[in-house]
């Protein structure tokens, strides 16, 4: 099988991915996050394009936007942005789910539709084209742009029954299509468990990234996850001093590199609010950092704490060329699922 990465404008050779921000946001068209803070509404194509051009100016080549259906995803706007940046920047979009708090526990389609019917919906987004209406119903209208990654999400310090259901659907979809997976972990909690569940269902650990571990600054926890499960940690939060200073994240990355775990580290900015991006901020009359922060501030800090240029290249380029490349599709084997996750499904009354 010829290896490929699936972008909005078509499949590319993994070698053409270049420096990649593996978890970010350019457009967020309302959704449940907007109820938490108005900064989660990001609807300026112009600001998004300017931000991307700064990323390109500093050597960036690819961005993975991690907005699943019904949580801010806007396929039409993103395709328009990708077309304007064609030849300069690769954009990858997501299908899948976020944390359970964003879905009605009784009436959402995640709650009502069985896993064996959800999986074909996700597979279709990857193999046929994303639904322009985000599976909001009752009409499905597929565009040409296909999803290139699957998102799952877990809440703070607990995995909800809807989240385990989504993890199962995401796992089967990954196995069926070969697509990679990224998991939102709320404040870096339940990361080990989420990864273990995906692996128990049969997902290739090399295709799993765990997001937001930087918000749970525990280098021993990081090492345990990598050592025991073989998955990758996506540190997506330089420029988040409200959680921790950059120096702490840089030192934790150095710690993992020194342990020999450089192949299990990726970096991103997760700049999913208006005031996390320079050009959105300027439109609001604010001076903010943006995508350039990674290159101007954080990468120099990594070098200052002793992370080598070779390790940085592995983190930004080589790892993602491997992780984001699709595996050969496999047939899901329910008999191979680990008994421990089946027991948990029974305890949580997931059919």
Curated annotation (Swiss-Prot):
Record text on cofactor binding: Binds 2 Zn(2+) ions per subunit.
GO molecular function, one term: zinc ion binding
One Pfam assignment: PTE
Keywords: Hydrolase, Metal-binding, Zinc
Cystine residue pairs: none
Positions of Zn(2+) 1 binding: 23, 25, 151, 270
Residues reported in the UniProt entry to bind Zn(2+) 2: 151, 184, 212
GO process annotations (BP): catabolic process
Cofactor: Zn(2+)
Taxonomic superkingdom: Bacteria
Residues bearing the modification N6-carboxylysine: 151
InterPro entries: Metal_Hydrolase, Phosphotriesterase
Family: Belongs to the metallo-dependent hydrolases superfamily. Phosphotriesterase family.
Name of the protein: Uncharacterized protein MPN_497
């Amino acid at each position: 099988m010829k290896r490929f990465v699936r972008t909005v404008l078509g499949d590319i050779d993994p070698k053409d991915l270049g420096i990649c921000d593996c978890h970010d946001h350019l457009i967020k068209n309302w959704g449940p996050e907007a109820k938490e803070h108005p900064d989660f509404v990001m609807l300026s194509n112009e600001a998004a394009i300017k931000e991307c051009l700064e990323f390109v100016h500093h050597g960036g080549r690819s961005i993975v936007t991690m907005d699943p259906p019904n949580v801010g995803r806007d396929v039409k706007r993103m395709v328009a942005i990708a077309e304007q940046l064609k030849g300069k920047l690769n954009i990858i979009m997501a299908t899948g789910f976020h944390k359970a708090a964003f879905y009605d526990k009784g009436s959402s389609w995640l709650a009502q539709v069985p896993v064996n019917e959800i999986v074909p919906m996700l597979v279709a987004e990857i193999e046929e084209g994303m639904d322009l209406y985000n599976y909001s119903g009752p009409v499905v209208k597929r565009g040409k742009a296909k999803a290139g990654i699957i998102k799952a999400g877990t809440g703070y310090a607990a995995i909800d029954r809807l989240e385990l259901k989504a993890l199962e659907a995401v796992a089967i979809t990954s196995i069926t299509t070969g697509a990679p997976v990224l998991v939102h972990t709320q404040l870096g909690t339940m990361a080990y468990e989420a990864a273990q569940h995906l692996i128990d269902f049969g997902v290739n650990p090399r295709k799993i990234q765990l997001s937001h571990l930087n918000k749970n600054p525990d280098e021993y926890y990081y090492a345990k996850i990598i050592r025991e499960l073989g998955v990758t940690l996506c540190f997506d939060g330089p420029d988040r001093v409200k959680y921790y200073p950059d120096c702490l994240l840089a030192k934790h990355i150095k710690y993992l590199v020194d342990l020999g775990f450089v192949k299990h580290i990726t970096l991103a900015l997760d700049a999913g609010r208006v005031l996390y991006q320079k050009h959105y901020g300027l439109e609001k009359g604010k001076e903010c950092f943006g995508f350039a922060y990674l290159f101007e501030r954080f990468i120099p800090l990594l070098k200052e704490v002793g992370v080598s240029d070779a390790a940085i290249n592995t983190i930004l380029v080589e790892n993602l060329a491997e992780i984001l490349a699709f595996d050969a599709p496999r047939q899901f084997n329910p008999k191979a699922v680990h008994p421990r996750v089946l027991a948990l499904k029974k305890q949580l009354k997931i059919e």
